[in-house]
Amino acid sequence: MKTKKPFFILLSIIFVFINSILYAQIEIPRNLKHAYEKGTRSLDGSPGPNYWQNFSDYTINVLFIPSERKLIGREKIIYNNNSPDILNRIVLRFYQDLFKKGSPREFQVNPSDVHDGVVLKKLFIEGIPVDLNDKSKANQVGTNLNIKLDSSLFIYPKSQTLFEIEWELTIPKFSNVRMGTYDSTSFSLSHIFPKFLD
């Protein structure tokens, strides 16, 4: 009879411990709590009633010169600001700058494939040219070009802005990462065009 009492005490402690774990309140991380309060996220993880997402529509024309392994591109991009915020800067992403001299990369590339990266020739915002040599207007960090907008070109909520760009890119000859050359007539082209972080 005496051996049953410690067993029931131990069983009771285990029962209380398991129930306290099962019914304990899990603390909601601050960033998620803020999203719940703003209505951009629901408690079940789905988008909330105030959820928004920016997006871009691209019209891309590319000339490929196989003998030079060169791409010459023109893009018209309509950027759609669906956020409640006024945007005073925007980021253009150059995925292929992983072959640019000095770019950090997580893999080895053939030294002869390292080049100047995506060469941005022209950038227009609503038809107004951006001085690409002015680092206060367009400053590249890694594979991102940070574009600071003049107040007359701020992107207002629920509005669209037209960006036009011209660029050039050399396809690597020996390193086939995201793109590459297989022989004189076979190429792999992926992530070739500059795009916005939406």
Residue ranges, per PLM feature:
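Bacterial N-terminal signal peptides
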Residues: 9-19
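Acidic/His-enriched low-complexity segments
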Residues: 24-198
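Generic hydrophobic alpha-helical membrane-segment signal
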Residues: 7-8, 47
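Positively charged n-region of N-terminal signal peptides that target proteins for export
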Residues: 1-6, 114
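Generic low-polarity alpha-helical segments
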Residues: 1-2, 10-11, 147
